[in-house]
């Protein structure tokens, strides 16, 4: 059996890109400063990069799954063009109060539940204890806890950081851009 690898699990909106609210078009997608360089450095450090994102706008009828997939393909290519290959992309299109019947449900994949993270663990052979979850909301931290991810990192680039969010996180950083330096400092 191949050796498991550590991963950086990344929330999307507010962590990788500026959260303009239900981002689903290329014209509205803006990488947060320093994120691409940080992702490249994290890959060089031996981490798998795994995107895990709730996309309730699909269930709410704000955009289609096809629109989301088109934007995701563009984002993936944009990162690859800059030397960053994502190892996995997982998304939850569901919401219990959705207006699109096929996606209006309570599921196991929507954060704070750990479904997407556990699916990635199984498919990519991830060492969860050596991994990091990076997100801008308490739900990201709760999903990481439920999936037994070693380090929960809350970033200030998205939703306002709450006391509950800080308490649920192991680290609070200004941005994903600060993560490589923080990890290196941990192992000095």
From Swiss-Prot:
<comment type="pathway">
    <text>Nucleotide-sugar biosynthesis; ADP-L-glycero-beta-D-manno-heptose biosynthesis; ADP-L-glycero-beta-D-manno-heptose from D-glycero-beta-D-manno-heptose 7-phosphate: step 2/4.</text>
</comment>
<feature type="active site" description="Nucleophile">
    <location>
        <position position="11"/>
    </location>
</feature>
<feature type="site" description="Stabilizes the phosphoryl group">
    <location>
        <position position="111"/>
    </location>
</feature>
<keyword id="KW-0448">Lipopolysaccharide biosynthesis</keyword>
<feature type="binding site">
    <location>
        <position position="13"/>
    </location>
    <ligand>
        <name>Mg(2+)</name>
    </ligand>
</feature>
<protein>
    <recommendedName>
        <fullName>D-glycero-beta-D-manno-heptose-1,7-bisphosphate 7-phosphatase</fullName>
        <ecNumber>3.1.3.82</ecNumber>
    </recommendedName>
</protein>
<feature type="binding site">
    <location>
        <position position="136"/>
    </location>
    <ligand>
        <name>Mg(2+)</name>
    </ligand>
</feature>
<feature type="binding site">
    <location>
        <position position="109"/>
    </location>
    <ligand>
        <name>Zn(2+)</name>
    </ligand>
</feature>
<feature type="binding site">
    <location>
        <begin position="53"/>
        <end position="56"/>
    </location>
    <ligand>
        <name>substrate</name>
    </ligand>
</feature>
<keyword id="KW-0862">Zinc</keyword>
<dbReference type="GO" id="GO:0034200">
    <property type="term" value="F:D-glycero-beta-D-manno-heptose 1,7-bisphosphate 7-phosphatase activity"/>
</dbReference>
<dbReference type="InterPro" id="IPR006543">
    <property type="entry name" value="Histidinol-phos"/>
</dbReference>
<feature type="binding site">
    <location>
        <position position="92"/>
    </location>
    <ligand>
        <name>Zn(2+)</name>
    </ligand>
</feature>
<feature type="binding site">
    <location>
        <position position="137"/>
    </location>
    <ligand>
        <name>substrate</name>
    </ligand>
</feature>
<dbReference type="GO" id="GO:0000287">
    <property type="term" value="F:magnesium ion binding"/>
</dbReference>
<feature type="active site" description="Proton donor">
    <location>
        <position position="13"/>
    </location>
</feature>
<feature type="site" description="Stabilizes the phosphoryl group">
    <location>
        <position position="53"/>
    </location>
</feature>
<dbReference type="GO" id="GO:0009244">
    <property type="term" value="P:lipopolysaccharide core region biosynthetic process"/>
</dbReference>
<dbReference type="InterPro" id="IPR036412">
    <property type="entry name" value="HAD-like_sf"/>
</dbReference>
<feature type="binding site">
    <location>
        <position position="11"/>
    </location>
    <ligand>
        <name>Mg(2+)</name>
    </ligand>
</feature>
<feature type="binding site">
    <location>
        <position position="137"/>
    </location>
    <ligand>
        <name>Mg(2+)</name>
    </ligand>
</feature>
<feature type="site" description="Contributes to substrate recognition">
    <location>
        <position position="110"/>
    </location>
</feature>
<comment type="pathway">
    <text>Bacterial outer membrane biogenesis; LPS core biosynthesis.</text>
</comment>
<keyword id="KW-0963">Cytoplasm</keyword>
<dbReference type="GO" id="GO:0005737">
    <property type="term" value="C:cytoplasm"/>
</dbReference>
<dbReference type="InterPro" id="IPR004446">
    <property type="entry name" value="Heptose_bisP_phosphatase"/>
</dbReference>
<keyword id="KW-0378">Hydrolase</keyword>
<keyword id="KW-0460">Magnesium</keyword>
<comment type="subunit">
    <text>Monomer.</text>
</comment>
<keyword id="KW-0119">Carbohydrate metabolism</keyword>
<feature type="binding site">
    <location>
        <position position="107"/>
    </location>
    <ligand>
        <name>Zn(2+)</name>
    </ligand>
</feature>
<dbReference type="GO" id="GO:0097171">
    <property type="term" value="P:ADP-L-glycero-beta-D-manno-heptose biosynthetic process"/>
</dbReference>
<feature type="binding site">
    <location>
        <begin position="110"/>
        <end position="111"/>
    </location>
    <ligand>
        <name>substrate</name>
    </ligand>
</feature>
<dbReference type="InterPro" id="IPR023214">
    <property type="entry name" value="HAD_sf"/>
</dbReference>
<feature type="binding site">
    <location>
        <begin position="11"/>
        <end position="13"/>
    </location>
    <ligand>
        <name>substrate</name>
    </ligand>
</feature>
<feature type="binding site">
    <location>
        <begin position="19"/>
        <end position="22"/>
    </location>
    <ligand>
        <name>substrate</name>
    </ligand>
</feature>
<dbReference type="Pfam" id="PF13242">
    <property type="entry name" value="Hydrolase_like"/>
</dbReference>
<keyword id="KW-0479">Metal-binding</keyword>
<comment type="similarity">
    <text>Belongs to the GmhB family.</text>
</comment>
<feature type="binding site">
    <location>
        <position position="94"/>
    </location>
    <ligand>
        <name>Zn(2+)</name>
    </ligand>
</feature>
<dbReference type="InterPro" id="IPR006549">
    <property type="entry name" value="HAD-SF_hydro_IIIA"/>
</dbReference>
<dbReference type="GO" id="GO:0008270">
    <property type="term" value="F:zinc ion binding"/>
</dbReference>
């Amino acid at each position: 059996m191949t050796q498991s690898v550590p991963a950086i699990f990344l929330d999307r909106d507010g962590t990788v890109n500026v959260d303009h609210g239900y981002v689903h078009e290329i014209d509205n997608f803006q990488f947060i400063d320093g994120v691409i360089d940080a992702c490249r450095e994290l890959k060089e450090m031996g981490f798998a990069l795994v995107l895990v994102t709730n996309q309730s706008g699909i269930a709410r009828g704000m955009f289609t799954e096809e629109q989301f997939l088109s934007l995701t393909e563009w984002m993936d290519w944009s990162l690859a063009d800059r030397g960053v290959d994502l190892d996995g992309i997982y998304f939850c299109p569901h919401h219990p109060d959705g207006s699109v019947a096929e996606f209006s449900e309570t599921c196991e994949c929507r954060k704070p539940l750990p479904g997407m993270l556990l699916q990635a663990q199984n498919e990519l052979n991830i060492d969860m204890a050596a991994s990091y979850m990076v997100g801008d909301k308490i739900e990201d931290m709760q999903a990481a806890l439920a999936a037994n991810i070693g380090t929960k990192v809350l970033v200030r680039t998205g939703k306002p950081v709450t006391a509950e969010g800080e308490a649920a996180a192991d680290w609070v950083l200004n941005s994903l851009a600060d993560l490589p330096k923080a990890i290196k400092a941990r192992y000095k």
